[in-house]
Amino acid sequence: MSAPRLIARHYHGHPHDESPRDCVVLDYDARFLRRKVLTCESGERLLVDLSHTTSLDHDGVLLLEGGGEIRVVAAPEPLLEVTADHLPRMAWHIGNRHTPCQIEASRLLIQRDHVIRAMLEQLGAQLREVEEPFTPEGGAYGHGRTHAHEHGHTNHHGQHHDHADHGHSHDHSHDQ
């Protein structure tokens, strides 16, 4: 197989281009990477070669060498929907086990896990298996997931960053 023609060495949590060149559809686990060849929705192969392991968010973009963006899309995956009369209590127990959790007003979404499922059932939660995109909270410091308990800076949400090293400039703020 030939080498990928598309190469991305930088990532941003939000798009800069109104119409990205292509997109990659990845589940939660596949969106945590440093170097990997991915297949775009069009079938084109993309080499992602980031400087450090990064958690790619839904609607983030990989910046192509030579210009252009590849949009990241969260793929549907098997999840467990959690509802309860005391949803904050369920969220606390899930968080206490360092389990990634998507928090919504009337429900929580977590990856399917029989141990966590048994705990939640014992606590009185109502559980339903669903298949949806998974976009859990980024953690206490807002930097997404890391290996082990690293507390270093992993992305640039809401912080100033230089664009000189990835082929485009801005006249707008990155504040959200």
Swiss-Prot record:
Keywords: Chaperone, Cytoplasm, Nickel, Nickel insertion. One of its GO terms (cellular component) is cytoplasm. It is found in: Cytoplasm. GO terms for molecular function: nickel cation binding; unfolded protein binding. Residues 134-176 are annotated as: Disordered. Belongs to the UreE family. Involved in urease metallocenter assembly. Binds nickel. Probably functions as a nickel donor during metallocenter assembly. This is Urease accessory protein UreE.
